[in-house]
Every structure is written in structure tokens, then in C-alpha cells.
Amino acid sequence: MYIPAWSASSVDAYTTCPKKYYHLRVARDVQDFPPSEAVVAGRELHKAFENAVNLHEPLPSSQAHWQGLVDKIKAIPGEKLPEHPFMLDEFHEPCDKRGAWTRGIADLVIKRGKEAIIIDYKTGKRKPSEQLALYAAYAFAYWPEIQKVHTAFIWLKEKKIDRKTYNREDAAGIWQSFLPAVARMRKSYETGDWPARPSGLCRQWCPCEGCCYCGK
């Protein structure tokens, strides 16, 4: 049975509602809602910030207040790896996509000696996320010389930055924090059991009209 490589976003989507995950990502028999104007604007902002950092393009005038941060990021010494893909097998060894057990793409990785910085630009509502913890574990697996990873979520709309630092000895705990959800997802693929998980999102934010909780 083919089970696609999991990512932080797929685990989050599955945990929110396995049934919705199934219809949108496995069976693909339900179309998600088209992106709202806010989502489209967020994607454009994300791209503009990426281009400002990676390609030295000017920011839109409405986002000029971020120019100071863009300049600081560009001035950080080290090897810059924009849009860096991570793919690991079940033994946490780097691999190609055919053997990938887990995967992710970091907006920006900066390597400098025994340390790395991983940055992710966010345009949605500020909320807790373990995505960059997972990316730190990826970095420890990819580069044995890395002993410390500094992460930063940059919340572009809310003008906030959430920073956290991980040491190499944190890697095992990071993996353990994801494994229960990954195991549940794998079991759903194997058994075909994708239970609905009703929540407030069912009222307006679920396209699965065939679900008894949709719209309630």
C-alpha cells in the first residue's frame, strides 16, 4: 500500500479531522473551498518577502516596514539555502522522494559552522506550531556537524516574530512528539478508517457536505 510521506502540515490536517483529510487528500472526491481574497493576498505577500530576501527585489510599499528585517536577514553570515527541501526515510537518513517517509520545505536555512537558522514566513493568523521544531530535527539529521538550530516564525500580517532554539539532544524528543499522530495516520491508510472529528470548523469551513457534521 502506498502511503505518502508525511509533513508537519499533513499531520496537522489529519489531526484536525481524519475524514476531511481523507476526502481532500486521499480520495480527492471533494474540492476544497477556493482561496479567499485574504489567502491570495497572503500568498502574494509571502512571495514578495521571499523575493526581497532571496532575489533582492524591493518590497511592496505597503510592506516597506519590513525592509529593516529583510536587510538584517540578508546580512546574516553563513550559507543561505532558500526554499530548502528536506526528505528523510524512516531511519532519519536523507533520501530522495521515492524513499521519503517525511518531508518539508524550509523558506530559508542559513548554515554557519555548528549552528543553523531556519526561518519560515507566515501570513495567516498567529498560532502555536511545531513545524519548525520538526525542521530542526530535519537539520540535525541532514548535517551531523550542526549542534544548535535557531528557528523563527515571521508573522508578516501581525508583525511578530516567534523564536526558539533547539540543541542536538532535543532531536529525539521532537521525533517522539510527532510519532503518535503519524502512527494514527498510517493506521487509517491501512484500515480505511477515517473518523470524523467534529469541531467549530464544521459550521463554515468544511467542504465535505456528505458528512453528518458539516454545517453544524
What function would you assign to each model-found segment?
Residues 1-216:
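RecB-family 4Fe-4S metal-dependent nuclease core
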